[in-house]
């Protein structure tokens, strides 16, 4: 026995014995403690940051609504209490395909976004003097839809007479899109029907769109539709949507309520994401019609003033408006575009100068808007006009005089350089 005890040896070293036993490892315990501590700190930081982010977002929202006239300053407490009672949104209801359907949640608390436009009666009378007397009758959105329906009936009758084998739209699809139209009539917020989102991808999207009766949509539905069509249509198709659906609805709303609904105003801002389609589908048709009202021009120009527009598109639309027959709305739009202070090509500047010089032989009393537009142009581009053009503008100031504005125009012209003076300076000999 003693020999056995003497010969008995450890199977392994001390390290192996320790590893084989269930000994607590302090390093792991410390690690877990550190992880729990980090989790608590992270959760505390996230909660703290969340409160700061929400507070800053609420402050920015209040500032924006005060700036745009969405509500008065005294309503801040009411709005804050209303927001706290609403709670957090249900994220499960948000569809991945939606483009921020609820990003304008504050809009649901008010019916209109743009406040009443104060219009001077005398200025409005002077404005109407320059409106086209032969302007075509303005069409409402309902008129456009009825015209489309009549054209479709004529097309179907012609196909039937020619015994065409072209497939017609399935009655089940017609029923589906009519149901979509019924939903859009009562739409306020939330997700749109998925069938509606497929319309821009259809070849006959225009026909399908008018099945939903856009003239009956709510303003919120039209805003969401504008977002979808701007994102999924090319410039030419978007121009059709703006001209046939958005523009008549905006004109009807302004004519009826003397102001523009908030959602329609935001739809205009969203439409400017495609500037070429916006100008060709909304702005230029309003100028060409000759019957654009003063309120319409002021509201549309406010959208232009608050949105960044590419220089080339701005130059093109200034050139087009300058070459049109004059109406009061032209002065408002030109003044807004001049105020952006873009570096315009000389061709556009020359067209703007000749736009004003056309009134040298006009004996009518020009509205204040025209004088304001001239002053803005001279202030921004006085050094980009030639000396001959400057002399012609000085002569124009003698023909059409405004007590307060014309002296400012003269002062800007006198105390400025001309573009040809800069090029005619002799080069210094080296």
UniProtKB/Swiss-Prot annotation:
This is Bystin. One of its GO terms (molecular function) is snoRNA binding. One of its GO terms (biological process) is rRNA processing. Residues 1-45, 65-113 are annotated as: Disordered. GO terms for cellular component: cytoplasm; nucleolus; preribosome, small subunit precursor. It comes from the Eukaryota. Keywords: Nucleus, Ribosome biogenesis. InterPro entries: Bystin. Residues 93-104 have a biased composition (Acidic residues). It is found in: Nucleus, Nucleolus. It comes from Nematostella vectensis (Starlet sea anemone). Belongs to the bystin family. Required for processing of 20S pre-rRNA precursor and biogenesis of 40S ribosomal subunits. Its main location: nucleus. The gene is bysl. Residues 68-78 have a biased composition (Basic and acidic residues). Residues 1-12, 26-35 have a biased composition (Basic residues).
């Amino acid at each position: 026995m003693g020999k056995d005890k003497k010969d008995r040896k450890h199977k392994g070293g001390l390290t192996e014995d320790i590893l084989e036993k269930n000994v607590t490892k302090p390093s792991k315990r410390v690690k877990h403690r550190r992880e729990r501590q980090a989790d608590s700190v992270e959760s505390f930081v996230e909660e703290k940051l969340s409160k700061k982010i929400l507070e800053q977002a609420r402050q920015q929202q209040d500032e924006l609504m005060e700036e745009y006239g969405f509500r008065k300053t005294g309503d801040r407490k009411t709005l804050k209490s209303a927001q706290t009672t609403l709670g957090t949104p249900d994220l499960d209801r948000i569809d991945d395909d939606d483009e921020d359907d609820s990003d304008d949640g504050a809009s649901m608390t008010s019916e209109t976004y743009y406040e009443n436009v104060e219009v001077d009666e005398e200025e409005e009378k002077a404005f109407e003097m320059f409106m086209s007397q032969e302007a075509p009758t303005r069409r409402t959105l309902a008129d456009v839809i009825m015209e489309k329906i009549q054209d479709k009936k004529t097309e179907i009758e012609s196909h039937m007479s020619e015994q065409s084998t072209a497939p017609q739209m399935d009655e089940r699809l017609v029923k589906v899109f009519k149901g979509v139209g019924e939903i859009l009539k009562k739409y306020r917020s939330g997700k749109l029907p998925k069938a509606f989102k497929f319309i821009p991808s259809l070849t006959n999207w225009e026909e399908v769109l008018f099945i939903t009766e856009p003239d009956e949509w709510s303003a919120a539905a039209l805003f969401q539709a504008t977002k979808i069509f701007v994102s999924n249509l090319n410039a030419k198709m978007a121009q059709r949507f703006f001209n046939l659906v958005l523009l008549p609805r905006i004109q009807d709303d302004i004519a009826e309520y003397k102001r523009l609904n908030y959602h329609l105003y935001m739809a205009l801002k969203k439409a400017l994401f495609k500037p070429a389609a916006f100008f060709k589908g909304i702005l230029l048709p309003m100028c060409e019609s000759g019957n654009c009202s003063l309120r319409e021009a002021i509201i549309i120009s406010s959208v232009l003033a608050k949105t960044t527009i590419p220089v080339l598109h701005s130059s093109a639309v200034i050139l087009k408006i300058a070459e049109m027959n004059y109406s009061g709305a032209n002065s408002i739009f030109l003044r807004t575009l001049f105020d952006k202070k873009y570096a315009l090509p000389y061709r556009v500047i020359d067209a703007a100068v000749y736009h004003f010089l056309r009134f040298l032989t006009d004996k009518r009393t020009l509205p204040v808007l025209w004088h304001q537009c001239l002053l803005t142009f001279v202030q921004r581009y006085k050094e980009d006009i030639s000396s001959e053009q400057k002399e012609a503008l000085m002569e124009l100031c003698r023909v059409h005089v405004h007590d307060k504005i014309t002296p400012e125009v003269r002062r800007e012209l006198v105390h400025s350089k001309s573009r040809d003076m800069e090029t005619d300076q002799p080069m210094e000999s080296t």
